């Protein structure tokens, strides 16, 4: 048995982080929905996933960061309108979604997917759907809201996060504007 089988792993993903004021506003809006199903995602965990990597060997992280640093970025801050509430029944989640993803965001996701191919992370088999998860284990219809969602997620960098026991920790970040 090789030492490789004992290599520690981290659960990683690339995402756009939410600013504290965005988190507060979204959490307040979610609270007004008075939801009676599911588990709320803690506001400090709000983000928009770009590319989920899953379990990654610790020894690969530096190379992944080097590859991410070479990703061609939009050159402008990203603005993603989160203007739709949706229930993804298969996953049991309530999400804030974007009616239309900005082309710059789609190009960034594609560039990240291409940069991760040499590490064995394949292109996502599904179409990228920008979203922010509000609730997990959600089993009801889309809730009615007195105020429609109109949140603009603004990002000037993208981040590599580690997920550990429900807590997300930023490991590295790269600017979108050079």
PLM features: residue spans?
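Histidine-dependent nucleotide/RNA phosphoesterase domain, centered on the 2H-phosphoesterase fold
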Residues: 1-178
């Amino acid at each position: 048995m090789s030492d490789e089988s004992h290599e520690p792993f981290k659960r990683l993903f690339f995402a756009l982080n939410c600013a504290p004021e965005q988190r507060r506003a979204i959490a307040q809006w979610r609270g007004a929905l008075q939801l009676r199903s599911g588990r709320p995602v803690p506001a400090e965990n709000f983000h928009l996933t770009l590319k989920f990597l899953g379990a990654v060997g610790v020894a690969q992280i530096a190379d992944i960061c080097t590859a991410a640093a070479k990703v061609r970025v939009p050159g402008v801050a990203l603005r993603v309108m989160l203007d739709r509430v949706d229930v993804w029944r298969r996953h049991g989640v309530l999400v804030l979604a974007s009616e239309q993803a900005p082309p710059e965001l789609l190009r960034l996701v594609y560039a990240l997917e291409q940069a991760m191919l040499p590490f064995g992370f394949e292109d996502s088999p599904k179409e990228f759907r920008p979203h922010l998860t509000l609730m997990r284990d959600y089993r009801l219809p889309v809730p009615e809201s007195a105020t429609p969602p109109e949140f603009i997620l603004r990002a000037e960098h993208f981040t590599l996060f580690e997920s550990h026991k429900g807590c997300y920790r930023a490991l590295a970040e790269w600017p979108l504007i050079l």
